[in-house]
């Protein structure tokens, strides 16, 4: 009975330690203003050395390549358009999708 309690206490302590380490390591990577700790701007660097920051895209998908999707119509550019389901009344939320637009016409990418 004593070994079971000791083992359970050890597993609980290990689990709590692991959870705390994970929490503190994840929060130490990002500072309060949302920048990565290792990320520096040009004004932070000595001697006026400017470094370009690699920025990641926001949430959602990336625009498609619209080459040769609009036939002979030019310019063919990607646009975000709302996709409304076939309901009689408009919804507050409906999904958006990428389409290729040329003039007033939309084409599937």
Curated annotation (Swiss-Prot):
Q: Which UniProt keywords apply?
A: Developmental protein, Disulfide bond, Secreted, Signal
Question: Record keywords: DNA-binding included?
Answer: no
Q: Which domain of life is it from?
A: Eukaryota
Disulfide bridge map: 66-100, 70-76, 73-102
Primary location group: secreted
Query: Which GO terms of type biological process are on file?
Result: guard cell differentiation; stomatal complex development
- The membrane-spanning stretches of this chain are none
Any one of the GO CC terms: extracellular region
Compartments it resides in? Secreted
- Which tissues is this protein detected in according to the database? Expressed at the base of the apical meristem at 3 days after germination. Not detected in the hypocotyl. Expressed in developing stems soon after bolting, in inflorescence stems and in young siliques.
Q: Which InterPro entries match?
A: EPFL
Subunit-level organization: Interacts with ERECTA.
Q: By what name is this protein known?
A: EPIDERMAL PATTERNING FACTOR-like protein 4
What species does this protein belong to? Arabidopsis thaliana (Mouse-ear cress)
Q: Which gene encodes it?
A: EPFL4
């Amino acid at each position: 009975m004593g070994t079971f309690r000791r083992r359970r206490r050890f597993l609980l302590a290990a689990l709590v330690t692991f959870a705390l380490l994970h929490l503190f390591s994840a929060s130490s990577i990002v500072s309060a203003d949302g920048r990565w700790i290792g990320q520096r701007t040009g004004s932070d660097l000595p001697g006026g050395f400017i470094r370009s920051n690699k920025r990641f895209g926001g949430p959602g998908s990336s625009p498609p390549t619209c080459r040769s999707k609009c036939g002979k119509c030019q310019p063919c550019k990607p646009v975000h358009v709302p996709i409304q389901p076939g309901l009689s009344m408009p919804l507050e939320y409906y999904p958006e999708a990428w389409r290729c637009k040329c003039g007033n016409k939309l084409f599937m990418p």
